[in-house]
Structure formats: structure tokens, C-alpha cells
Design a protein with these regions (language model features):
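Catalytic machinery of carbohydrate-active enzymes
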Residues: 1-362
């Protein structure tokens, strides 16, 4: 037992390790020589980011920094959607009772809790870690774990501070973790190709129009007539247009596809959705999961925004943010509160089309 290398990246403790199954090696051979596959783990790092899939994707730039600063580390990530995590995460963990029990029973060198959800902060309090950053609980109240998280904390409890913020989300979370953001990009594994290839011409530039923004956020909706007009205008300019969306957008997209005579392949799994986005050269989109997929796949983007602070978004030089010509008072509000008008009615098709043309230029 004394010769077991439990600090090896391949050691499991419950089943034979990969090198043993493949090469029949032991941690130390009969001559006392260590296994040639021995890979000692440095820091054990746990990220807690449960939330929405888009939030998980836009947190992945941290992985690049962590692997740069701690190349021998083993990174664990606890989330509601482990299937979206890239291969750079050594140990993806679903937010389930078995996972929680295990994490509560083992030590970490560094814990990064980037969620303010009470369950995430409660778990962060209970896990044994030499260093904790992000958010935690104090007498049942969510508070910053260190001074580095105070500014991000304040933007979440005071609207005026949030509106005045000029830092992007990656800058904020890097600062929370004690790092400086240097343009580290999203980490998103290439999507699986569809069993049946998408029926796209292959000769034209493809523009995807993601028409939805979630049922809750009606303040962000752009009218169907605008999407239809934009699709027609893009077709006239020689682009191939494909509509994107989930189950909530199915009826809308079916209607727009018929009216504008553009392609719509229906809604499917997240992997298939990502595969279709990957075929696009440019995506026009509101602030949604699809926005983060688009950025993660390195596609050009025109982002429609009205209720969020535009400084929050890091587009990595991939596109533009377009906003209504009239001021919007619906900051973080799910329904429009502007007296007398809906601000999204003052985001013209011509304005969005011009942005598409600018973004698509070499």
C-alpha cells in the first residue's frame, strides 16, 4: 500500500487506472521503479458555477488562466449542466446529492464560488479548502468571500452601481479570482456533426437569426415583422438565411420562414443547435444562451441589447452591439416599463442590417 501513488492524475481508487488496463503497469514495479505514466497532481481547484448554461459558458475563460498559472492542477467544476463543460475540466460534476457528499468529504487547495445562489454559497461554506474566493454565507446572508469580490457583489444589489459599471463579465470574474483578464477566450468543445448534414448551399455566406430571448424577458423581444424584413433584406444581399431557436420559438420561426422564404430546421438538442450555429458565418441574436455559443465558436455576431449594461459583454472583436434609438428604462426588467412606447420598436431593421454588413466585411 505504501507504494501507491494516490496523487497521480490517473489513480482512481475504485477501479484500475487507464495505464494499468492498457499497459499492465503498477505505481511502482517489482524493481522499485516508478510508473512511467505517473503524473503528479499539483493544486486541486474547485469551481462552483451552477447557473444557466450561458453563464457557465461565459465563465470558461477562467480555465485558460488557471491552467496557465497552475499547469499541473486538477480542475473540478460543479454545475447543473456538466454536459456543456469542455474537456479542459478534469472532473465535471453534476449538482446532485452524491456529488455534494463527495465534495464535502475531500480537501481542495482553491475553491472559486462564482454563484450567489444560496445553495452554492452554503456548499462553499462546508467544503474544506485552503483558499476560498467569490461568494460565501455569513449568518445565512450571501456576502463576498474576499475584498476582490466586493465590486461584483455591489453591482448585484444596487441598480445604479450596475448601470455605471464599465467592466465586462470576464474582467469581473477574473478580478474576483485574483487575476487580470488579458483577452482569454471562451473554451467550448467543437459540437458533434449532425447525422444528416444541414442542407445549406455551401456557396453563400450563412447568417443565422436567433429570434427568441426566453419567455420571461418579453421586454427584449424584437417584433416578428422585423425579423421577417431582416431575413428578406439579407437574402437580397446574397446571404443564405437560417432561423435559429428552441422549442419556445418554433411557432414564430415557422411563421417567419414561410413569410421570408428562408430555412428553418426546427428545434433539437443543444449539440445539434451548436452544430447549426457552427455552420453560420454571422449570427444576429439577443442576450441568450445562443449568444455565448456563438462567441464560443468564434462566429461573427450582431447583438441586440436594450435592458442590460452593454459593457457587460465581451465580444472579442467578433461584432457589434446594437441598441434602440430611444432610451430604455427597462434595466433588468422582464416587461417593458417605458411610458408610451416599447423601446425595441425603435431598433430599426435598417440599423441591424447595416451592422450585419459592417461586421461581415473582411
Amino acid at each position: 500500500m505504501a507504494t501507491l501513488k494516490t496523487d497521480c492524475r490517473f489513480f482512481r481508487g475504485t477501479v484500475p487506472c487507464g495505464p494499468h488496463k492498457k499497459h499492465q503497469v503498477h505505481c511502482v514495479d517489482e524493481a522499485g521503479r516508478p510508473c512511467s505514466h505517473y503524473d503528479r497532481i499539483g493544486k486541486e481547484i474547485l469551481i462552483i458555477k451552477l447557473g444557466a448554461i450561458g453563464d457557465v459558458i461565459r465563465t470558461t475563460p477562467l480555465l485558460r488562466k488557471l491552467k496557465d498559472v497552475h499547469p499541473d492542477s486538477r480542475i473540478w467544476w460543479l454545475t447543473l449542466t456538466p454536459e456543456i463543460l469542455p474537456k479542459l475540466v478534469d472532473e465535471p460534476m453534476a449538482f446532485t446529492l452524491p456529488s455534494i457528499l463527495y465534495l464535502q468529504s475531500r480537501p481542495f487547495d482553491l475553491l472559486l464560488n462564482l454563484d450567489k445562489d444560496r445553495e452554492a454559497c452554503a456548499l462553499a461554506e462546508q467544503i474544506d479548502a485552503k483558499e476560498k474566493k467569490g461568494f460565501r454565507l455569513d449568518k445565512g446572508i450571501v456576502v463576498p468571500a474576499t475584498a476582490e469580490s466586493e465590486q461584483k457583489y455591489l453591482t448585484g444589489i444596487f441598480d445604479d452601481i450596475s448601470k455605471a459599471n464599465t467592466k465586462s463579465y470576464p474582467v469581473e470574474i477574473f478580478e474576483m479570482c485574483g487575476f487580470q483578464f488579458n483577452g482569454e477566450q471562451y473554451v467550448l468543445d467543437a459540437p458533434e456533426p449532425p447525422k444528416t448534414p444541414w442542407t445549406l448551399s455551401g456557396k453563400k455566406r450563412v447568417v443565422g437569426l436567433n429570434t427568441g430571448c426566453g419567455a420571461r424577458w418579453t421586454s427584449r423581444l424584437w417584433a416578428d415583422k422585423n425579423w421577417t424584413a431582416l431575413a428578406r433584406a439579407l437574402k437580397r444581399k446574397g446571404y443564405e438565411v437560417v432561423l435559429l431557436g428552441g422549442e419556445q420559438e418554433h411557432a414564430k420561426n415557422t411563421k417567419i420562414a414561410r413569410a421570408a422564404k428562408v430555412k428553418y430546421f426546427g428545434h433539437s438538442s443543444l449539440q445539434m443547435f451548436m452544430s447549426l450555429v457552427d455552420r453560420c458565418d454571422l449570427v444576429v441574436i439577443a442576450v441568450t444562451l445562443a449568444m455565448h455559443v456563438t462567441i464560443g465558436l468564434g462566429k461573427k455576431i450582431v447583438l441586440l441589447n436594450n435592458i442590460f449594461n452593454k459593457h457587460e459583454f465581451e465580444l472579442y472583436g467578433l461584432g457589434e452591439i446594437v441598441e434602440p434609438s430611444k432610451p430604455c428604462r427597462c434595466f433588468f426588467k422582464p416587461t417593458c416599463v417605458n411610458p408610451g412606447y416599447r423601446c425595441m420598436e425603435h431598433l430599426s431593421v435598417e440599423h441591424v442590417l447595416s451592422a450585419c454588413v459592417r461586421v461581415r466585411k473582411p
